[in-house]
Structure formats: C-alpha cells, structure tokens
Design a protein with these regions (language model features):
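Short, charged helix-capping/linker segments at alpha-helix termini
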Residues: 1-2, 15-24, 34-53, 158, ...
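Arg/Lys-rich amphipathic alpha helix in sigma70-family domain 2
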Residues: 60-67, 78-97, 115, 176-178
Length: 185
C-alpha cells in the first residue's frame, strides 16, 4: 500500500510521525543519494554517511517540505549537495579511490583496464573542477535530472544552470586533456 503512494504523500505522512511511510522513501532514493554524494566526494564511505545524514534531515524537516515549491527528489538532491559540499570543505577531506575486480579472461581484462584508466582520467579531472561545476555535472549527467530540476536543486535559475553546465563541460574537457598529458609524460 505505502509503495504505491507518491513521494510527496509519503513525506506528508512522515511529517505527521508515521515511521512506516519513511521506509519506502529510503528504499526508493537511498541509492541515488549515495551516487550523488559519491560523485561530489569521490569517497564511498563518506557518501554513505552523507546519504544517511540526508535522510535524517528529511525525517527531521519533513514538515517544512512544500510540494508546491519542488518535487521530493529535488529537495533531497539539494540536501545531499549541501551536506556533500560541507563535508568537502572540511580539512582532511580527500577522495578515496575504489578498487574494482578485474575480469579473468585476457581480452575482457584488457578492455576493463582501458575503461578503468579512462574512468580514472575523467574522475581525476572532475575532482579538479570547482565544486559548483562538479555538482552541475553530477546532477545533470550522473543523476539524469532535467535542467530545470538540477537548477532547482542548486538554487539557480534555469538560465544560470545552463550557463554553469556549459562552463563545467568546457572546463572538464580541458581538465581531461591536461590529466591525460600529465599521465603520458
């Protein structure tokens, strides 16, 4: 029954203290919150912490959610972004790279290694971008939000978000070239 209710209906029920209404929200959106936090932080452990903290904030602030101003997912993304950026600004916050398993057969293993190298170049370049540019790319390209949704999550006008995204893409391309050159020398 609860699984069929909209996110907004579930938040309203959670705001009135219904803990059972909160579980489907977590089930639906925890993975997305973790992915967004990891795209910003580059650290799986911290991303898990941020996602959990975000849902704690959602629970504590459910009564302040206004479905007329934004969808639940946009509100959640804004909370995750704010928490991740705050965490990034803390001294000693460094991205931690993850080690993936390499496939056993040689052609697949080689393709996997090449793909890993390319991903590492993009990841390194991404973490060299200013945090707002990184957030714009993460929301639009990794999370698949529309320009309007991403703009709302970042508290920007659509036009300002589009401009930020264009600058972010240009900067990312430049950083990818620079990282590739550094690795080749």
């Amino acid at each position: 029954m609860l699984e069929k209710e909209s996110d907004e209906e579930l938040v309203a029920r959670a705001a009135s203290g219904d803990q059972r209404a909160f579980r489907p929200l977590i089930a639906r959106h925890m993975g997305r919150a973790i992915r967004l936090a990891q795209a910003i932080l580059g650290n799986a452990t911290e991303a898990d912490d941020i996602a959990q903290e975000a849902f704690l904030r959602v629970w504590n602030q459910a009564s302040s959610f206004d479905p007329d101003l934004a969808r639940f997912t946009t509100w959640l993304h804004r909370i995750v972004l704010n928490l991740a950026i705050d965490r990034m600004r803390r001294p000693g916050s460094e991205p931690i790279e993850r080690a993936d398993d390499v496939a056993s057969d040689a052609p697949s293993a080689l393709a996997h290694i090449i793909a890993e190298q390319e991903q590492e170049i993009v990841r390194t370049a991404l973490f060299e971008l200013p945090e707002r540019q990184r957030a714009a790319i993460a929301l639009f390209h990794f999370e698949g939000l529309s320009g309007r949704e991403a703009a709302t999550a970042m508290d920007l006008s659509e036009k300002a978000f589009e401009s930020l995204l264009i600058r972010a893409r240009t900067a990312l391309k430049q950083r990818v070239i620079a990282v590739t050159r550094r690795q080749q020398s």
